[in-house]
């Protein structure tokens, strides 16, 4: 049995979402904060997939245990997919949730198409390099003003029609059921036995080779 897996993030909001959704997962999920500070991964990937893998493998190699990481963001159609991988730092150096939301509203001023989607890619990596990848997406639109007090990031602006609420107006249970991250984590829960078996096999190898990341797309358990 795999004793633990570390969640490669210092974002406590993400930690809460992961731990809540995966509370019945058969592996102990530990927060990165429990291991003390480590060098930050360089998130210079061209998409969410690359950045999630970079964070997961970076953490797994440093700590010597499996790591799970996500990269997620908002893609606004009228802005050609922006802010995308730059969602957390959209308003520049020292960006905050508030400044990012303000920047988004400025960029969308006068635009009729306010459709958008949240995307989340989760990578589970072993210290030797292999990784499994999961993805979730949620479609909505950007409002002209903030609504709600819960959540984080762009949640106060992201309107989800099915509930007639923004993500910041949803309870944690509601958000976890429909959000991009919730959908990706639901896939992980559904494949928990296979994931545990895969991790055990990889960790039992003395010198696991570091394959190309694309080799593991589609989660082929035979590799």
Curated annotation (Swiss-Prot):
A GO biological-process term: purine nucleoside triphosphate catabolic process
GO molecular-function terms, A-Z: dITP diphosphatase activity; ITP diphosphatase activity; metal ion binding; nucleotide binding; ribonucleoside triphosphate phosphatase activity; XTP diphosphatase activity
Sequence segments annotated as region (Disordered): 203-223
Presence of the UniProt keyword Metal-binding in the record: yes
Cofactor remark: Binds 1 Mg(2+) ion per subunit.
Assembly and interaction partners: Homodimer.
Role summary: Pyrophosphatase that catalyzes the hydrolysis of nucleoside triphosphates to their monophosphate derivatives, with a high preference for the non-canonical purine nucleotides XTP (xanthosine triphosphate), dITP (deoxyinosine triphosphate) and ITP. Seems to function as a house-cleaning enzyme that removes non-canonical purine nucleotides from the nucleotide pool, thus preventing their incorporation into DNA/RNA and avoiding chromosomal lesions.
Protein known as: dITP/XTP pyrophosphatase
């Amino acid at each position: 049995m795999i004793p633990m897996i570390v969640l490669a993030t210092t974002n406590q909001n993400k930690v809460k979402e992961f731990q809540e959704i995966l509370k019945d997962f058969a592996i102990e999920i530990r927060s990165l904060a429990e291991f003390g500070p480590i060098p930050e991964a360089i998130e210079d990937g061209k998409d969410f997939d690359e950045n999630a893998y970079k964070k997961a493998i970076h953490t797994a190699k440093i700590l010597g245990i499996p790591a799970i990481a996500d990269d997620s963001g908002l893609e606004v159609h009228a802005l050609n997919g922006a802010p995308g991988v730059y969602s957390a730092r959209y308003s520049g150096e020292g960006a905050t949730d508030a400044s990012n939301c303000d920047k988004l509203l400025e960029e969308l001023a006068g635009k009729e198409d306010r459709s958008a989607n949240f995307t989340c890619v989760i990578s589970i990596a072993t210290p030797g390099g292999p990784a499994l990848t999961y993805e979730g997406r949620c479609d909505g639109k950007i409002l002209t003003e903030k609504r709600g007090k819960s959540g984080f990031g762009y949640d106060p602006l992201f309107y989800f029609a099915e509930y007639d609420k923004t993500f910041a107006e949803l309870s944690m249970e509601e958000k976890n059921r429909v959000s991009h991250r919730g959908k990706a984590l639901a896939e992980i829960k559904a494949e928990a036995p296979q994931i545990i078996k895969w991790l055990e096999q990889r960790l039992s190898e003395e010198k696991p080779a570091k394959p190309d990341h694309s080799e593991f797309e589609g989660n082929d358990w035979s590799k």
